[in-house]
Amino acid sequence: MKDLAEYKNEIHSCSKCGLCQSVCPIYEVTKNDCSVSRGMFIMLKGLLKGELKMSKKLNRYLDLCLKCGACTKFCPSGINIVDIIASAKAKYFQSHPMEKFISFIQSKLIFGLGIKTLGLFSKNITSQKFDKKVIYFGGCGGNLKGNKSVISILNACDIEVITPLFDCCGIPFYVRGDKNSFEKAKQKFINLIEKYNTREIVTTCASCEKTLKSYNIDGLIVKNIFEYIREQNLKLKLKKKIRATFHKPCNIENYNDIEWILNNTENLEYIQMKNFDKCCGLNEIFKLSDYKILSKIPKEKHNNIRQTNVKTVLTSCLGCEAALSLYSFGKYKVCDLTEFLAKNITQ
């Protein structure tokens, strides 16, 4: 993670065109220019010039950012806005002890998830010889859910799966601005994969995939499981007919593979919801001070799901799965796409 001062040129290259306003979910709700990247960059310019201080008020606006990356995708100047906001958060984090205390508690909770649960973990099919070998990065979700789904699908793709017990990829620390904890998570990952003779990593979570790729480790290949399914042209057939919709996580980098699966799985009737690729609002759900305003984002997603009249909502990000489940109110079930396929396809 770079220091904020290293982004000086990018911050000054913002043309104030306002395209970010048209795609920012937070601006759509608040209509406050300080809550969108254009307004934030004006404040960050003042911060770098010494005209402003890193105050709680400025941090509040930084905190409003969902880190969905919609502004980055539409920015004509190609500015990586999410990384700049994260660096600004890191600057605030360094000078505020309470932020460090909260992150310390968070790290204890996250790194404490590395406990295997009986019955959730399995091994490769011992009677089969595989053409390929990959390492499965489960992260927080893999440690809680197990690896059965991943192994069964990848074994069907003629791929052997190595399953070390990884810790969190570090993305919660990154968005919070806890640079030290993020670097610690990265180093723990590097130390673990160095024990194995393969440099190909597979994950089922879009946020984990994007974070691991951001490590920029030489020779490391990071893919999501859906790439392998499509590469092998794996025939997928559900045991019974199921109608489902899909929420596209903001961090997903290759939706084409998932789209292929949704449209080529026999007995799966895929109903695309309105704004299926719009942020679920995960980063704002627990910000109680702005709850009345920010709860509109997940509520809109819930309403879009309800309009499809389905009982099954699929996604491919642990955070999105948690956020969508929180607002489901028992009206539908939210499932990880990998687990859904492993549970419902015919063998």
Task: Locate the predicted segments by residue.
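N-terminal cysteine/histidine-rich coordination modules
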Residues: 1-60
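Cofactor-cradling patches in redox/metallo enzymes
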Residues: 78, 139-224, 253-347
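Conserved hydrophobic helix-helix packing surfaces used for dimerization/oligomerization
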Residues: 134-136, 243-244, 313
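Cysteine-centered iron-sulfur cluster-binding motifs in ferredoxin-type domains/subunits
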Residues: 9-27, 59-79, 249-251, 277-278
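C-terminal amphipathic alpha-helical segment
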Residues: 225, 231-265
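Phosphate-coordination loops involved in phosphoryl transfer and adenosine-cofactor binding
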Residues: 131, 240-241, 310
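Short glycine-enriched loops at secondary-structure junctions
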Residues: 29-30, 206-207, 228
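Iron-sulfur-cluster electron-transfer modules
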Residues: 41-216
